Amino acid sequence: DRPKALGDIRGVSYVYPLMWRFGVLRVPEIVEKNMSLTLEFGFFRDLKEAETMNQLMRTTPEEMGLHSQNILNLLERLEKENISVVSMMLLRHNQVLYKAYWPPYTQEQLRTVYSLSKTFTAMAIGIAAGEGKIRLDERIVDLFPEQAKNAPDSPQLQMLTIRHLLMMSTGQGNEPFHQENAWDDAISAFLREPFADAPGETFRYNTGATYMLSAALKQRGIDLEEYLRDKLLTPMGITGTRWIRDPNGICTGGFGFSLH
């Protein structure tokens, strides 16, 4: 009995910045409109507090004191500017006001989250640290002694820790994976990269640093994807995942994660 509308609108994956830009975030309300998308308004008033995403209570914008016209304006603006949207879900006070998937995308499809993969990797490190399986002050050369033997020795490399990888403050001057054939042995490629600063001094975006977090977990016998699935995703009701792996079977960490 949930009202649905099908349509053919084009939109954006990063909707929230657009909502801010268009002034909609001040009043995030929803509308059911016969456009090029599938809308789902739920009416589960009697659900207890949700334990997973699939159990979140559904409601209507007006029941939360909001005006649907604001979201209608956003959808029309997205269509007018020919901006591609894959899906959108809005919540207020832990209740779903609006949920939509733009054809041909559906809720069942795995979607690649690109560099948001880094956030999931960092969460896995946090969980592992909380369980005592890894320490933030552990030195990288101690985690990878064999590869470190063949890397150019430097004071910076000796200082480098898990914490520096998390902060993207490795001190390396460039992205390590620009090297030819780097993915044949990505750990060694990372350790070979020259330093420009001492670790902890300067932030530089570094996908290789997040890969090394995944590799560090692997050194402890922990597969990143399986660990996240067990500790975080399955308890949240997220059951479908896939992560790109390097030739040695290590999840890429900084990219390549897909989930429902």
Residue positions per predicted region:
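Active-site-proximal alpha-helical segments within enzyme catalytic domains
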Residues: 212-216, 255-260
